Every structure is written in structure tokens, then in C-alpha cells.
Amino acid sequence: ERLAALYPEYGLGKEDDGVAFRRARLSIRGTIYENIGFKAQYDFAVDSPGNDGGQFRDVYIELLELPFVDKARIGHFQEPFSLEEIPSNSYMTFMERSLANVFVPSFNTGLTVEKSMLSKRLHWTLGIFKTTDFWPSDNDSNEAAGYGVTGRITGVPWKAEDGDTFVHLGASFNRRNP
């Protein structure tokens, strides 16, 4: 589904440069009985130092159109934190995310519930996660032993009649317990 290569120039012993795949992803996604969604995505490329093989990115099941919330999702997926982290890199303007993004939790295992209100002008998501992405480092320490609560609320207080111009405001929080 997605393939991206890069030409890094770095010194690793006798190798001064090389070619590597930044991402080589294959995924499947769908809906069963109109109210059960699923996605499984595997990245075959080496993603970070210390990771010699691929890894799962998204593996989840979601229940749609629930009584008090729009959606409940369980599995391994991105925590609802930061407008810059959530969108796919396919929709990014720049090649890299900003430096501040290194402090954002990424893919972890958890459960979220979300709801849109006021004609989809207000949206909130709340979730509990088990830290599994070894953030902030890729060493073999006990950093992956904690749990976290993450929430995000976004709103569109003003929207032009053409629908293309609007003001988007949002806030998110994250509390980790190592």
C-alpha cells in the first residue's frame, strides 16, 4: 500500500552511505455488518535503531454507532494526541514532522471512545493505553511498563459559508504512570 525509500549518508564502519526503505507497508481494512470496523497494517521497513525487522503499526477493531459514543476502538493504534502526529505521512506537507513531535506518544495498545457533537463541529476522544512503543527510547529498559490516559478535544467555532475556510481549535492531554 505504501513504499518510500531514502538515501542516507552516514558512517557505519566501512559503509559511508546506502539505500534503505523508510516505509514499506501492507494493510487491510474493512467493515463487517456495517458497525464493526477493523484494520491491520504491517511495516516491513526498519523503522528505528535497534529494530532489525518490521513491526505492526495499526491492528485494531472498532465498534461503530454505539449508544452514547460514536465509536469505541481496541487494539494497537495511535494515541489521540497532537494534530501533527495523527494524520498519515501521505498527507504531510514536509518530509519530517516537527521537532516537538518527539515528545508525543505514538502507537500503543489501548481502548478509546470518541464522540462528535453539534453537527460534527465538536469532537472528543478519550483512551487508556499500555505503553508498548518504547517511547522515548529504543533501549531495553522498563519504560514500556506504564499505563497512560490520553484525551483530545477539537472544535470548529467558525466556518465560512463555502465550507473551505474555518477556525480549528484543539487541546489534548496525556498522563503516564510508569
Predicted regions and their residues:
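Outer membrane beta-barrel
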Residues: E1-F134, N139-P178
